[in-house]
């Protein structure tokens, strides 16, 4: 039986009541949005990018350029391309022999053209300014994908030392960082979006990664994270992983072909010298040791072993089934082994494997800050440090890198800060992420 509604008695409509205006609460909500809400990055990121652009212009105009390595880069490039010397053991500059792979040579040959050696350093500074801003834009894209709160994003722009490394020093580390940020961004985009282009992305990502290695070997600190992430992105298909990894070797051969044809042994010995000794007086991280201990091979082996243990522990805590899945991939290299949610584990593995490498690095010179500074907003966020403590940690960390010359006090503080951050990451993040893995029916 239907109820008949009388037209004389229509349902009453609720009157719209405007909420009371509370300017103080609105202000609090606005501040909370641009400080803690990831959506606030739509406001914060463009503003910070604009401020960075203006700041870099000011730094270039107001602070004199400091020559450290750029002149040596130019001398080495001229010895190669003007004198025709391709023997890596004979190519030298004002600061010593050429110790970087052929990608470095290629990039600084281009820079030599634009700056005409040392004649137009200001042109080189402008190029490095653009390099900084492009790298920052990629960082922001990565942060946005990872839903970092704006207060963490701001940390990426607060380093006095980092600005100096780029536009006042012109170090080659900046180009390695550019390629590594691009590589991590590619893998992060893939991990955040289900796509059938896994093979394409992992192959192109491997090419970018190899480009970074061909500029400077510090990119190898990402290698453990790269191997596991590539395996996961390719869903355990070993053949796809091998194809992607082969691209690394392909680029190394292509970019160094001129040297490999002429003096292959000398090139490999000079460009990839893992036994190279670093100068103790410029090492920021181990000043609380004496120089003999710093140069001791036992100390170097201990650092390498500690790095290996930390990386393996981190990986197996996050992905305890890795050995079993890897064994299955070996037995069936063309078969899909795992399908997993990669949104957290891929960027986390990449950034923390690099950070562990930095913590146990034999030496950290001032320019090496660029190796990992861009990952600090993510690491601090993942460590679950509250905002006040996060800023305190960052300020203390920045103090260490701006303390000149390297000294015992800053060195102890730097090691303590980085070790404590790694411990917080272990406490808050080191739990199985890939546990409910869907397996393809055989």
UniProtKB/Swiss-Prot annotation:
Pathway given in the UniProt record: Protein modification; protein glycosylation
Similarity comment: Belongs to the glycosyltransferase ALG3 family.
GO terms (BP aspect): dolichol-linked oligosaccharide biosynthetic process
Cellular component per GO, a single term: endoplasmic reticulum membrane
Gene transcribed to yield this protein: ALG3
Domain of life assignment: Eukaryota
Record EC number: 2.4.1.258
Intervals, Lumenal compartment: 1-42, 109-164, 224-236, 319-336, 397-409
Biological role: Dol-P-Man:Man(5)GlcNAc(2)-PP-Dol alpha-1,3-mannosyltransferase that operates in the biosynthetic pathway of dolichol-linked oligosaccharides, the glycan precursors employed in protein asparagine (N)-glycosylation. The assembly of dolichol-linked oligosaccharides begins on the cytosolic side of the endoplasmic reticulum membrane and finishes in its lumen. The sequential addition of sugars to dolichol pyrophosphate produces dolichol-linked oligosaccharides containing fourteen sugars, including two GlcNAcs, nine mannoses and three glucoses.
Designated name of the protein: Dol-P-Man:Man(5)GlcNAc(2)-PP-Dol alpha-1,3-mannosyltransferase
Signal sequence, renumbered to the chain: none
Membrane topology qualifier: Multi-pass membrane protein
Coiled-coil intervals, chain numbering: none
GO MF terms, alphabetically ordered: dol-P-Man:Man(5)GlcNAc(2)-PP-Dol alpha-1,3-mannosyltransferase activity
């Amino acid at each position: 039986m239907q109820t008949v509604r009388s037209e004389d008695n229509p349902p009453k409509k609720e009157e719209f009541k405007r909420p009371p205006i509370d300017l103080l609460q609105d202000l609090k909500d606005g501040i909370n949005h641009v400080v803690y809400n990831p959506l606030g990055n739509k406001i914060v990121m463009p503003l910070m990018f604009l401020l960075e652009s203006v700041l870099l212009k000011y730094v270039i105009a107001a602070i004199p350029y400091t020559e450290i390595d750029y002149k040596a880069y130019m001398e080495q490039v001229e010895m190669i391309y003007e004198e025709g010397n391709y023997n890596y053991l004979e190519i030298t500059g004002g600061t010593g022999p050429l110790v970087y792979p052929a990608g470095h040579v290629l990039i600084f040959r281009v820079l030599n053209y634009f700056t005409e050696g040392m004649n137009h350093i200001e042109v080189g500074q402008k190029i490095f300014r653009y390099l900084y801003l492009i790298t920052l834009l990629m960082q922001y894209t990565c942060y946005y994908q990872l839903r970092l709160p704006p207060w963490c994003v701001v940390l990426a722009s607060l380093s006095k030392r980092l600005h100096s490394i780029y536009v006042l020093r012109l170090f080659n580390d900046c180009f390695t960082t550019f390629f590594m940020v691009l590589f991590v961004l590619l893998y992060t985009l893939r991990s955040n979006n289900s796509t059938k282009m896994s093979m394409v992305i992992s192959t192109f990502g491997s090419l970018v990664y190899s480009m970074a290695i061909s500029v400077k070997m510090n990119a190898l600190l990402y290698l453990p994270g790269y191997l596991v992430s590539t395996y996961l992105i390719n869903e355990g298909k070993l053949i796809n992983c091998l194809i992607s990894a082969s691209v690394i070797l392909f680029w190394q051969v292509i970019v160094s072909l001129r040297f490999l044809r002429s003096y292959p042994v000398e090139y490999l010995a000079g460009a990839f010298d893992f036994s190279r000794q670093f100068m103790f007086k410029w090492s920021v991280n181990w000043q609380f040791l004496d120089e003999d201990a710093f140069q001791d091979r036992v100390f170097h082996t201990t650092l390498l072993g500690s790095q290996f243990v930390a990386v393996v522990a981190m990986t197996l805590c996050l992905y305890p089934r890795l050995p079993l899945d890897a064994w299955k991939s070996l037995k069936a290299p063309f078969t899909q082994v795992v399908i997993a949610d990669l949104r957290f584990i891929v960027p986390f593995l990449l950034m923390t494997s690099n950070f562990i490498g930095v913590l146990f690095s034999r030496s950290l010179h001032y320019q090496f800050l660029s190796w990992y500074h861009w990952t600090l907003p993510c690491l601090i966020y993942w460590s679950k440090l509250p905002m006040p403590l996060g800023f305190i940690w960052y300020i203390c960390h920045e103090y260490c890198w701006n303390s000149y010359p390297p000294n015992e006090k800053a060195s102890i503080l730097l090691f303590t800060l980085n070790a404590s951050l790694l411990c917080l990451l272990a406490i808050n993040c080191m739990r199985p992420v890939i546990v409910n893995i869907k397996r393809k029916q055989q």
